[in-house]
Amino acid sequence: MANPRDLIPSATTPAPLAGVRVVDLSRILAGPLCTMVLADLGADVIKVERPGEGDDTRHWGPPFAGEDAAYFLSLNRNKRSVTADLGSPEGVSLVHRLVATADVLIENFRPGLMSRFDLGLDDLRESHPRLVTCSLTAFGADALETASRPGYDIIVQAMSGLMSVTGERDGEPTKAGVALLDVITGLYAAVGVLAALRERDATGSGRHVSVALYDASVAAMVNQAANYLIGGIVPGRLGTAHPNIVPYQSFHAKDRPFILAAGNDRLFARTCEVVGHASWADDRRFATNEARVVHRDELIPLLSEAFAERRMHEWLALLDEAGVPCAPIMAMDEVFSSSEGAAQVEQIDDPVRGLLRLVASPIRFDDLAPSTRTPPPTLGEHDVEVRRELEGGPDP
């Protein structure tokens, strides 16, 4: 089987969004992730940044490669960078000229700020009816009390309920280990933009897409939100355990913890056989998942005692042989030492920063996979190139 990283666009398999131009006024994570998804799919993304400073994430290190933080590099491949001071007539003029050539404009300023820059989205779409615009906000432009509040991921993790269900049962609320809600919001925004482009191609008219970090975050609560809305259950923290499935959590073997995911009664019965207690599957307290959820505090200590008798690799081998989903809990070095993790790494020959190793796009098509056409840009790297394009002159 071919390595997915070898399945790259060619002259006969152009990238799906080839020919689409995106003006990217976003920064930090959610917006840049959205535009990176579009760039990976072939769009020409022009990232507009503040002169001398650029996207804040350029400075969110160490570690750094060259002058830019790894954080920035993880979100900005396949883009071009131009600098523009939106507080100056020249900067605003540049954005207007870019928009005149664009299919999509994406921004994540606080509500109302684009109009202060003389870049009101309604005015832009009136001048360019085919333009798709996308705003990523913290709480939505219409939120009465919170519209102007900044939307850092950790703030919304706290306000959306995510932190209330994350952490050990008797511990403090804990944030997720990555800015997961920014990632989810960026993906929702990309879906919305793609849908608006599809509609634009059919009708000839663009549409405004709006995604609020808070809204996407509450939507991401899925079953936990439904447990409350339907059952009136205020969920709490369960560590690695699942509120609706038992056993579905980490257990500590003799040497280290691992994950067990017995997602149905059949898998639970197999687990009981593996640990040498087949009778547990017939115990009325544990025979069904509903019963196991009710009697969680009786079952988990029994399983914990059994799993403490062997080393992790022994249990994983036995569970895997029985067809029970299980996995080691891996650190980053273990992830990228595994065959699966290594296959997701792309090596990029960056003429400024040297050889970069970054995580590649996870999207696969039957005959291609998005690849890094260009490394993440240095600040203002394409100032001359893009301005010459707008003037109709040759590339430098």
Where are these regions (language model features)?
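Acyl-CoA thioester-binding alpha/beta core of soluble enzymes
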Residues: 1-52, 108, 127, 132-134, ...
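NAD(P)-dependent dehydrogenases' Rossmann-like dinucleotide-binding region
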Residues: 154, 188, 209-217, 263
